[in-house]
Amino acid sequence: MALISSAAVTTINRAPVQANLATPFTGLKSSAGFPVTKKNNDITSITSNGSRVNCMQVWPPVGKKKFETLSYLPPLTDEQLLKEVEYLLRKGWVPCVEFELEKGFVHRQYNSSPGYYDGRYWTMWRLPLFGTTDAAQVLKEVAECKAEYPEAFIRIIGFDNVRQVQCISFIASTPKVY
């Protein structure tokens, strides 16, 4: 009977295992069937908005006040106001009419830091219109507020009473001076 050392058996058995561990995985298919797009690193091919820069305008900082949402647009017509109110009603928000008699824009009067008296808090016209489904009713409230205070800034806000946040705010009427 021939005796073989255990070291020789171990060496013989380990050699093929190490060779198998070193071979790369070749089970992936070739990507020859996929379409290939050629990358272009040339920066001159990037499109530019240079032609549109000439028609862009800057908001004039003197003589024009920015108020609320949409303040960069001309005053909204009654039809446009109706569509905005219909939008906030569709979202399920509660419409509310507010007015300001002096300054309808953010201003610092008593302190340099923001606070209660910086023009963001306006006087509420009556109560919020809970349960309102008709946009014309909201515009009727705006007209009544305007009749009572003709030289007031009037805005419409949309309040989400579930999240308890104001979601939209826009100017419905400004004094003739502005």
UniProtKB/Swiss-Prot annotation:
Gene Ontology CC annotation, any one: chloroplast
Disulfide pairings: none
Keyword check for Nucleotide-binding: no
Keyword Nuclease: no
HAMAP family xrefs: RuBisCO_S_bact (MF_00859)
Family: Belongs to the RuBisCO small chain family.
Its biological purpose: RuBisCO catalyzes two reactions: the carboxylation of D-ribulose 1,5-bisphosphate, the primary event in carbon dioxide fixation, as well as the oxidative fragmentation of the pentose substrate. Both reactions occur simultaneously and in competition at the same active site. Although the small subunit is not catalytic it is essential for maximal activity.
Listed name of the protein: Ribulose bisphosphate carboxylase small subunit, chloroplastic
Native species: Trifolium repens (Creeping white clover)
Annotated gene: RBCS
